Every structure is written in structure tokens, then in C-alpha cells.
A protein has these predicted regions:
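Juxtamembrane regions of bacterial inner-membrane/periplasmic proteins
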Residues: 2-239
Length: 239
């Protein structure tokens, strides 16, 4: 009888653990759904308003504070009509040639990148689309991790569903990093070329587009070879 009592006494403990585990799982799912819904509201609001700041901008500010370095932010969002078509075309040619036709992910480009990485036996360029980069800038950080990629892959379809391609491009051109504390086309064109974004010529636009992959290290004046490659891509597309 004593043995039976011990067995019976052990069952409630197992049942309690299962209940707690179930509660944790349900709580985690509810939290994830709540965050997803909050992101959906934020993305929907971006149809009409520009973000006052972004996750990447906040990351840079915190990093500067922790390192005791000065931080000066230059961020002046402007409508797409005030951004030179030269820059719009240069950025699309450089970063996401199939931007207008895909739905957030460029599977063809991803396959090419994967094949190149396998051949080189190391990870190379990311192959992220403009939409993916926008999501990273708005909601995530510059840190590379599987968790960040997972969150990115859940948010990209939402952005594509709720925003037009023109609005996605407009937001992207206004929030991406173009140098230390320099965010967006207007700030970048004023800083590097001393003209508003609406007045950028083809060469200036190509040089700005060329530094996007590594904005804290590259300088437009040093991008002769890559900027020419971008100009060639633009010409092939009819831009």
C-alpha cells in the first residue's frame, strides 16, 4: 500500500509540471502574437507617417553612449518625389534588381548567394531585398543571428501586404544608414554632395548607392569601380 501511495503521490507533481509547461507555451505564443499585432499596427501607420526613429538608429545611439563617444544624428525624411529618380534607380540596381516584381524575398538571388557561399566555403553577401533591409532597420538590429532572421522572415510578408512598393522604397531611402549618424537620402546627399536629394545626378547617385552595404566604412569618393558597375546595371535596365 505504501508503494501505491508513493506512485499516487508522484502523479500530481508530473501533472503540475505539464500544466506549468502548457501555461508557459501558451503565454509565449500570446506574447509573440501581441508583438506581431503591435508591429502590424506600426506598419499600417507607416502608410501615412514617417518613423521618428528606427531600431538601428537607437542601436547606434546606445552604442555611442556606452563607448563614451559623441553621437550626432542627421535624419530628414522627404517624400519620394523629392528624391532624384537617379538615386531611386541606382539603389534598386545595386541592392534589389527584382524589387518591383518579387513579394519581399528574391529567391533567385538567395540561391545565387547560397551557391557562391558553398563554393567559397564561407558566408558572403547577404542577398537581402530592400523590404528585408527596411524591416531590419525599422524593427531589428544590425546583429546577425538566426533569431533575427526568423523575426525578419515573419515581418517581411506583413510589410509587403500593408504597404505599396513606392512606400516601401520611400521609407527605405529615408531610414537607411549612409554613414556615421547619417540616415536617409536627404541627409546623405547634403553631407556628401552638398545638394538636396532631388538634385543628385547619375554619378553621385551611383556612388551613394555603392556605400549602402558598408556605410560606416565606405566613402562615395572611393567607390569608382563599384559605382561604375551600378551605372552599367542602370543602363542595361534602361535607366
Amino acid at each position: 500500500m505504501a508503494i501505491k501511495k508513493r506512485k499516487a503521490g508522484g502523479r500530481p507533481s508530473v501533472t503540475k509540471k505539464k500544466k506549468w509547461l502548457r501555461k508557459i507555451v501558451i503565454g509565449g505564443l500570446l506574447l509573440a502574437l501581441s508583438l506581431y499585432a503591435l508591429c502590424a499596427v506600426c506598419v499600417l501607420a507607416l502608410r501615412w507617417i514617417n518613423p521618428p526613429t528606427t531600431a538601428v538608429q537607437m542601436e547606434r545611439r546606445v552604442s555611442a553612449i556606452l563607448k563614451g563617444r559623441p553621437y550626432h544624428k542627421h535624419y530628414d525624411p522627404v517624400p519620394l518625389r523629392r528624391i532624384s529618380p537617379n538615386l531611386q534607380h541606382a539603389v534598386v540596381a545595386a541592392e534589389d534588381g527584382r524589387f518591383r516584381t518579387h513579394h519581399g524575398f528574391d529567391w533567385i538571388e538567395m540561391q545565387k548567394v547560397l551557391e557562391q557561399d558553398i563554393q567559397r566555403h564561407k558566408l558572403g553577401r547577404g542577398g537581402s531585398t530592400i523590404t528585408q533591409q527596411l524591416v531590419k532597420n525599422l524593427f531589428l538590429t544590425t546583429e546577425r543571428s538566426l533569431v533575427r532572421k526568423g523575426v525578419e522572415f515573419t515581418l517581411v510578408p506583413m510589410v509587403e501586404a500593408l504597404l505599396t512598393k513606392d512606400r516601401i522604397l520611400e521609407l527605405y531611402l529615408n531610414v537607411i544608414e549612409w554613414g556615421p549618424g547619417i540616415y536617409g537620402a536627404e541627409a546623405a546627399s547634403e553631407y556628401y554632395d552638398h545638394v538636396p536629394a532631388s538634385e543628385l545626378n547619375r554619378e553621385q547617385a551611383a556612388r551613394l548607392a555603392a556605400i549602402i552595404p558598408s556605410p560606416l566604412k565606405r566613402k562615395p569618393a572611393q567607390m569608382n569601380e563599384y559605382s561604375q558597375e551600378i551605372l552599367d546595371r542602370m543602363a542595361k535596365t534602361g535607366w
